[in-house]
Amino acid sequence: AGLNPIAIEDLTGFPEMMDGRVKTLHPAVHGGVLARRDLETHMASMAEHNIAPIDLVCVNLYPFEQTIRREGVSEPEAIEQIDIGGPALVRSAAKNHPFVAVVTMPSQYDSLVTELSQHDGCTSFALRRELASAAFARTAEYDATIAAWMSGTSGTTFPSVLRLNYVGQHQLRYGENPHQAAAVY
């Protein structure tokens, strides 16, 4: 596909540690993602610390949701599937969407590839904004799932906060009245 990926250790100059728990939480990664390209001070900091700009972040979060659905999964197994660096990286990229595209689901790959091929390897602000919105929704869903699981395993009958995620099914022609928009979730 014309990509030249490099190992995270080569980017950071620092090896993975703590059984892979610490990989991407590094200024060479987050600095490259969070730097505003329109601020001279940000660009000067990047140059001073030899940080390259990162324009595209693609993260598939650890499969926590699938792990806790498995029969007989232990609490330590589930906890090891709680992604820390992935959501942090996703949120960094989504925050800086005026300059960075963030992809969080394989279903987004085709639209990204189409956009890149149509815009000489670049993405439009509209796509970056759409992807950022989806990224924040994904990390919110991920965190809500973790919170619900932890609440359910702590012996609490009812969680103090209950978050529900609804998936859009389709848009309706109109709402209760013809001038209103509506959708089914």
Region locations from a protein language model:
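A short linear-motif detector with a strong N-terminal bias
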Residues: 9-14, 35-38, 79-82, 126, ...
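Short coil/turn connectors at secondary-structure junctions
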Residues: 2-4, 27-30, 51-56, 65, ...
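Residue-level detector of functional hotspots within protein domains
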Residues: 19, 42-43, 68, 73, ...
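A short, charged helix-loop
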Residues: 56-80, 84-123, 185
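Active-site loops and adjacent core secondary-structure elements that bind or stabilize anionic groups
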Residues: 17, 108-185
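Glycine-rich nucleotide/cofactor/substrate-binding loop typically near the N-terminus or early
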Residues: 2-64
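Electropositive phosphate-/nucleotide-binding environments in soluble metabolic enzymes
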Residues: 23, 27, 36, 40, ...
